[in-house]
């Protein structure tokens, strides 16, 4: 079906900009793509890391370009000279910008994938450290934990009375490793550990992950 002459997509290809207009449009599109990082990565995760080039990827690039075009056409942002332009658009103008947006998208996803690989490497190192050495404090990841009279302590200041009277280093190690492995089964990011609780309640050891918005009480 023929596209309406007044549609945003046709408008995008109808009017032309001089080189200064092209640069303004290019910079605006790149900024929008960078600000759409969260949206892009959500789509990438939902596609389970499929190869770039799908219809949804192309839709995001087009969406970014049309949003920036509409922004430039607004009364506040659009130069008067641009509003008066009626020359046919040189398609190479948009093709160049579209390719640059594709490159930016690939760069964002490449950076994300490298981060996942780094997180996986750190997670494996942390688990190996727990298995090979005295139990490392998951909060400071520097000193060894000590368990005495059912109280877990660390030189970093961690001090947590346990509800279990028979808590041992082996049991705490198994609990930590079990929770970390359970989390890594559905999220590639490294969880963080912290101590919660104030003066009127017993402190607890909490494992949380901002990436998948989950948490668990370890101790």
From Swiss-Prot:
Q: What does the entry's PTM section describe?
A: Sumoylated; required for localization in the nuclear PML body and transport of RPA complex in PML body. Upon UV irradiation and during S phase, it is desumoylated, releasing RPA complex that is translocated to sites of DNA damage. Sumoylation takes place at different Lys residues.
Q: Where in the cell is it found?
A: Nucleus
GO biological processes: protein import into nucleus
Give the boundaries of each RIP-type zinc finger. Answer: 137-212
A molecular function annotated in GO for this UniProt entry is: zinc ion binding
Domain of life of the native organism: Eukaryota
> Quaternary form?
Interacts with the RPA1 subunit of RPA complex.
**Name of the protein this chain belongs to:** RPA-interacting protein
Q: Which organism is it from?
A: Rattus norvegicus (Rat)
Q: Which gene encodes it?
A: Rpain
